[in-house]
């Protein structure tokens, strides 16, 4: 990890007019939404800043994501993943993080489409950077970066932690393989690392049948849930209804291509 940005002084923690969250996820692509789903389900107040430009939307048809035997429209896949994160408890802010600073006493303040000192600022204890391929907002944090030609990657410890305490990174931004399923898995891994570091009680994110733990004389571990048969059937019915609604007709959003091929005029 060769290129370390210069560190700027922390900003004031006078955030009375700023939104406060446990976790800020920068980027609403596959890795970011996967991370947000896990942190929100673990009970951490999570907000995702998303400019709507996930690179996965350039795919004509996603054909290697588990669970879709005939593939899935990439724009629909993004919509479904966003809805899953929302149902899990994540909030969303449309826009782009343009500035990120450490805060006196811990945590971070982020500027959305503006400086951190504007009313658009967000405060979070933890940040997950999942904004492939933008790292410009990290310039003042002194995080370890690796420049490879036109690409810049964030160094991590293998589990999503960066060289800056409280800052995590997920997906292609950490030089993981450029595949949707890899990004989803790494987003989940990074989120679980963050949850453990936050000291939030957590064992696994499991929904189990009634008695799975308690009938063996065990308490239900943190992060897990036992549900009875009636609740299982209710959730299954809801999932069928939700999926049928998503797949009722073709997705209306037009196919995207590489930005260099788009005529801006």
Task: List the predicted regions and their residue ranges.
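Conserved beta-strand-loop-beta-strand element in the redox core of flavoprotein oxidoreductases
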Residues: 101-121
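A conserved beta-strand/loop element that lines the FAD pocket in flavoprotein oxidoreductases
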Residues: 86-99
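Beta1-alpha1 glycine-rich phosphate/pyrophosphate-binding loop at the start
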Residues: 21-76
């Amino acid at each position: 990890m060769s290129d370390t940005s210069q560190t700027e002084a922390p900003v004031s923690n006078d955030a009375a007019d700023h939104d406060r969250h446990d976790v800020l996820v920068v980027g609403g692509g596959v890795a970011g939404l996967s991370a947000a789903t896990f942190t929100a389900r673990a009970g951490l107040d999570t907000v995702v800043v998303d400019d709507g430009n996930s690179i996965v939307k350039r795919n004509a048809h996603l054909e290697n994501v588990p669970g879709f035997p005939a593939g899935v429209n990439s724009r629909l896949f993004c919509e479904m993943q966003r809805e899953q994160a929302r149902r899990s408890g994540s909030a969303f802010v449309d826009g782009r993080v343009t500035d990120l600073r450490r805060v006196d006493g811990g945590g971070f303040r982020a500027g959305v489409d503006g400086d951190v000192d504007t009313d658009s600022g967000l405060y979070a204890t933890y940040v997950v950077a999942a904004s492939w391929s933008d790292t410009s907002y990290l310039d003042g944090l002194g995080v370890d970066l690796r420049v490879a030609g036109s690409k810049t990657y964030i160094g991590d410890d293998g589990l999503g932690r960066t060289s800056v305490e409280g800052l995590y990174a997920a997906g292609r931004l950490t030089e993981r393989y450029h595949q949707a399923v890899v990004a989803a898995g790494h987003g989940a891994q990074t989120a679980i690392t963050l949850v453990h570091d936050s000291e939030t009680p957590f064992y696994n994110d499991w929904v189990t049948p009634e008695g799975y733990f308690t009938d063996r004389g065990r308490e239900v571990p943190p992060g897990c849930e036992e549900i009875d048969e009636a609740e299982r059937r209710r959730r299954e019915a809801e999932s069928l209804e939700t999926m049928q609604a998503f797949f009722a007709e073709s997705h209306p959003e037009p196919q995207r291509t590489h930005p260099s091929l788009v005529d801006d005029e």
